[in-house]
Amino acid sequence: MSSIAPLSELIPALKRKECTAYDIIEQVRRNINDNETDINAFINVFLEQAQTQALELDNKNIRPNPKKPLAGLPIAIKDNICVKGESCTCASKILADFISPYDATVVKRLKNAGAIIIGKTNLDEFAMGSSNETSTFGVVRNPLDKTKVAGGSSGGSAAVIAYGGAAAALGSDTGGSARQPAAFCGLVGFRPSYGRVSRYGLVAFASSLDQICPITQTVEDAALIYSIIAGPDENDSTTYPQTPDIMELTEKLPQGTRIAYIKECFDDLDSEMKQAIMRPFQDTGIDLIELSLPLVKQSVAAYLILTFAEASSNLARYDGIRYGLRVAKKGLMETYFATRGQGLGKEVKRRILIGTFGLSEGYIDAYYNTALKYRAALSKQYADAFAKVDFLLSPTAPSTAFKIGEKKDNPLSMYLSDIYTTSNALAALPSISIPSPYKIENLPVGIQLTAPRRQDAKLLGFAHALERHF
């Protein structure tokens, strides 16, 4: 498998003129040519544009600097995030020919920082899935073991970094869609506090949970990308008005840090997984305490009710009238039915149907409103926990990467892949997945840390120090 150095190494190399932006793009091109046919991580690749941009930067002697910290560095973008003039398919037949007329705020900020957008990555259709098997463009294979999934829904973004097709990538995370693929591919996946990163230009799945996230090789790289894309945005009223704190990354573990593992997240966990997550802390001399958060056990059920309901509303816009696929029939209703019937995949239809049912008269109180009450109670339980500790520890996923096709026809089993990443998402908390130094059958295991709301900088700083000690 090919690879590329992390941003934290490429940036000083560019500054010292040990390589050029074109050299980096050429390495990426070779990696894509060597791996992409087997892995299927990209939906579109912009190699010619990237080469042109790299040459322009080199000719002008523009290297990473305070105004353009990512000058010459290739970044991949999940294909549910808008890049002006390029396709934004959401891996769905209904948007297969859609061209975005504008840049998402995060893309605009990356471009302003000098980044080269190398391509758009594969995903589960409309980001609905945990294995990248619902994409109309085919499954993404895990570069570490091509018989295994890369995770989902941001499987393409994770796989691209794992084989060296970009230096960093953006994914999206509604209930684990960036953290779980990062765990499966041995990478870092950081989900910021809800509202820290603008969602403008992200195609909506469940608006109250969706977040754009960096997927990188190191915590330092994730912190750099986050520092560029985070901050208030007048186009997204859910963003915090304050500029996020600057991360001070240190290799020294802060003294007196209190970490608790969530009891309910380890009760039914495989013993090998448990050891791979706990042992690194024992090795570094960090004492863990046990903390019970009983409500996390119901998080998947509440997450599904709420996200399916929001999806049924958000995806109502795909009707074949204004944009996207249109299957013309004699009558308007027939056109709607034919367009959505042919344009949307099985899993997306399932979620829309269940979500619509949960919002229907006579059932909304029993399902949707009950889930909202649960969400509020869960958030309070997390707040109470953080009055006692600084960080909470849990697995990122219940297993290492599973085989392609293993869960595809078992929706419940697939949904439970997100059992450890939905509760902190529902509570709008920042969380990060970092790879354990211990593997299981040569496959990586993700360690997840969660911090109080808006403590993103503190979480990144601690995760960076922990990563260095691992």
Label every PLM stretch briefly:
Residues 1-52:
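An N-terminal boundary/leader segment
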Residues 64-84, 117-120, 260, 394-396:
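ATP-grasp fold ATP-binding core
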Residues 103-104, 108-229, 427-437, 443-446:
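Short glycine/serine-rich loop segments
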Residues 69-106:
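Enzymes and membrane/adaptor proteins characterized by extended Gly/Ser/Thr/Asp/Glu-rich
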Residues 191-274, 334-338, 469-470:
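A short helix-breaking turn/cap at a secondary-structure junction
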Residues 21-26, 55-58, 247, 269-292, ...:
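Acyltransferase
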Residues 72, 84, 211, 234-312, ...:
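Gly/Ser-rich, acidic/histidine-flanked active-site/gating loops
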